[in-house]
Amino acid sequence: MVQQIWETLKETITAYTGLSPAAFFTVLALAFAVYQVVSGFFVSPEVHRPRSLEVQPQSEPLPPPVQLGEITEEELKLYDGSDSKKPLLMAIKGQIYDVSQSRMFYGPGGPYALFAGKDASRALAKMSFEDQDLTGDISGLGAFELEALQDWEYKFMSKYVKVGTIQKKDGEGKESSEPSEAKTASAEGLSTNTGEEASAITHDETSRSTGEKIAETTEKKDVATDDDDAAKE
């Protein structure tokens, strides 16, 4: 049965193509190979991508921001992105923000990596990357620079979570308290001096009034004595 089918197939191939069965199947195989090569230029690579590559591992979600409270500038430096297990932090005007979601910008190798782990208020206001500007000291800045810094602060407040503040140095607290104490002492001294002056003035006026009264009484007595003497004469 199979032999009959094969003989019939060979006769049909020879009758319709003029080729031997071996030549016919060779041409058919070459045509299929050419089709596969040509179709590869027009079909999207995703069609030929292995299924194992289609399932890409999802990136791990970022942990929720952790509130740190008040920390020093030295402690803030530990969150500059060098340790991938720690959040990436940055401060503006003493307020610390978690910028881990923008690690591509503020993390190692990013365009703003120098600002991470620091209060970069002055650098942001001046758009400077100089080491001396990587500080939270904004004294001496112009109106335009302060406005630019304000824009940065609004951006951070709307995009990132605030996780703490930078602890003020002891010197700053003393400097701020000493002028107040000096003002208080000055005010107390002024009040005391004013009270003493007022008391002295009142005492002088009282003394003058008493002296004037005594003088008037003496004059009256002298006049009365003179009148008596005149009457006797």
From Swiss-Prot:
Its main location: membrane. Disulfide bonds: none annotated. Residues 70-167 are annotated as: Steroid-binding. Keywords: Cell membrane, Lipid-binding, Membrane, Phosphoprotein, Steroid-binding, Transmembrane, Transmembrane helix. One of its GO terms (cellular component) is plasma membrane. The keyword Transmembrane applies. Residues 169-233 are annotated as: Disordered. Residues 70-167 form the Cytochrome b5 heme-binding domain. GO terms for molecular function: protein domain specific binding; steroid binding. The keyword Transferase does not apply. It is found in: Cell membrane. The modification Phosphothreonine is found at residue 225. The chain crosses the membrane at residues 23-43. Residues 169-181, 202-224 have a biased composition (Basic and acidic residues). The cytochrome b5 heme-binding domain lacks the conserved iron-binding His residues at positions 105 and 129. Belongs to the cytochrome b5 family. MAPR subfamily. This is Membrane steroid-binding protein 2.
